[in-house]
Amino acid sequence: VELPHPVTGTAFASPVPPGQGWPDDLAAGDTPVACSASDVAALAADASLDQVTACSSVCRACARLVQWREDVASTKRHSFAGEPYWGRPTPGWGDPEAGVLIVGLAPAANGGNRTGRIFTGDRSGDWLFAALHRTGFANQPTSEHAGDGLRLAGVRVVATVRCAPPDNKPTPAERDACSAWLDREVGLLLPSVRAVVALGSYAWTAALTTLGRLGVSIPRPRPKFGHGAEVVLPRVVGAVTLIGSYHPSQQNTFTGKLTEQMLDDVFTRAAAVAGE
């Protein structure tokens, strides 16, 4: 069954096949598909940023995640039953020459897995993009769907794992399989990135691991995560400052553990570090 895209009105199947005109979809019908962790590593090794975006968006390396993301896309949450679900991996998105890189955990089953854009279509994204708008990184305060006119300047958002995982918990093997996409994307962004904001302890650990693999000096013992935690990581040219933030999950925002001001302060600090 094909259903109309909420922004463009074009009809799509769920999951969305590549090359059908979904907003911001860089994949085509002949984009190479990774079916194993070794495939991911091979395809990511010398890919451009656009190629990472395209190839990672059709990845099928992790059977459990493929099954879950596509099952969710087929069954759909009742409130979204009339629209198509992306149902594919959600690639990094934003400024290709960003001074600030935001690292999250994974897309939400009815958020990024539905809309095709990271942190888009759920409460966490509502908080994140509103904060990015208040701090000058986004041209509008909302992110509802790919194609909605949102643009980021000076910042890019990536996920540690690109598929929505059951219970928001990827396995270590799934994290490791996806890490080659993350390593390549971060490596391509590193010439411009001065600040990395990790949303939650999982992203903090992943960011340290990725940066270490890319040649950035990581202190021992490893710096501990905390909201507002900050560590300067030396590299051959300049340094990268890693900044921790509580994840803007409903668990944190509803309870007041994370407030709008706390999130704004993190991005204001990141902007200052990056000179944005």
Regions found by a protein language model. Give the residues of each.
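A polyanion-binding, active-site-adjacent surface
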Residues: 4-233, 238-275
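The feature marks either
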Residues: 1
